[in-house]
Structures are given as structure tokens and as C-alpha cells.
């Protein structure tokens, strides 16, 4: 019905002004960039992905010995994202996965790349144990959570502002405690 096409430009052209070549002439502008690393071309080197929340645009850049080359062909491998997107390795397999906004919370996509960059939805809404109930971890669309191993136990925890924004909530990832592996999505609200 109203399908959208993804067009990839021929970026092999050199654009110059006064004899000076622009290094990323076709990448467009960035207004509210969120920067993450991922191995886009599976060569063992971390590349760069910029998510611009002002247009929900993903801009991939290949790391060529410290020179970042705009590579729009990788955009189609990413799921549709809006408001925010961060890349971090949730399951400790050495491949950065996608954390992104999802209806008052967040979704996680696993990096399933083998020969080509690919992702698979793990959960469309991450829950946390608030004592007696499992509720979604609220993450505002105007903010970005911190996703890091806060307690140094080997799995990624989440820091986010409370729903009213008055304080920071700590959601401890219980994967290592429950299974001994970090490939489980199991969070617990911790004060």
C-alpha cells in the first residue's frame, strides 16, 4: 500500500570546492547525533554508526585505518528506530546489539551477523522486576538511557530517569546471577 523504498546513492563521486575534496559529502547533516560502534563489514574492526534523533536517520561509517567513510548501503540492515538508538553487546558474544526506543520503554535487537550484517528482535519491551510486579522500564523518548556494566558483574545494566524525571532509576541486569551467562534479559529495579 504505502511502502517506502530505500535508495542508496553512488557515493564514489568526488565533490570539491575550491579544489578541496569533501570527505563525507553525501552523508548529510547531523543535528542530534548519538554515536555507537559496531563492526559493519565484519572485518574485525569497529566502525561507526550515528543515529540522528531529529530525523531518525542512521548514518553508517566504515573505519578505514582511522578514516571514516560514509557507507549508506548498511542502513537497510538496521531495523526501523526512532527517538534514540544505542549499540552495546547485551549477550557477550563480541557483537554490538541494538537498544532502541519502544513505546515508553526500549526494545533489544540481537546482532545475528555471520556473513552479512543482520539483527533479530529479542524483545519489543524490556521489563524489570519492581518487587511484586514486572513492569516495562520507562525510558522517555526525549532522553537516552545509560547502558553499562554498573556493578562490574559482566552484564549490562540500565540507568534511566524515572517517569517524572525526578531521580535516576538503576535496573540491575540479573542475567549473570540467574544463569551465569549474560544472554538473558532479566532486570531488577534496585534502589
Where are these regions (language model features)?
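Beta-propeller blade termini and top-face loops
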Residues: 35, 102-103, 110-113, 145
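Beta-propeller blade termini
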Residues: 32-40, 81-90, 141-150
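A short loop-to-beta-strand structural motif that recurs across blades of beta-propeller domains
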Residues: 57-60, 105-107, 167-169
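Residue-level signature of beta-propeller blades and closely related beta-rich strand-turn architectures
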Residues: 52-54, 102-104, 112, 162-164, ...
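Repeat-solenoid scaffold signature
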Residues: 137-175
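Acidic/hydrophobic-patterned starts of short beta strands in beta-sheet-rich repeat architectures
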Residues: 42-52, 92-101, 152-162
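Beta-strand-rich domains and repeat architectures in extracellular enzymes and scaffolds
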Residues: 16-55
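Blade-edge motifs of beta-propeller repeat domains
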Residues: 3-29, 62-80, 112-140, 175-191
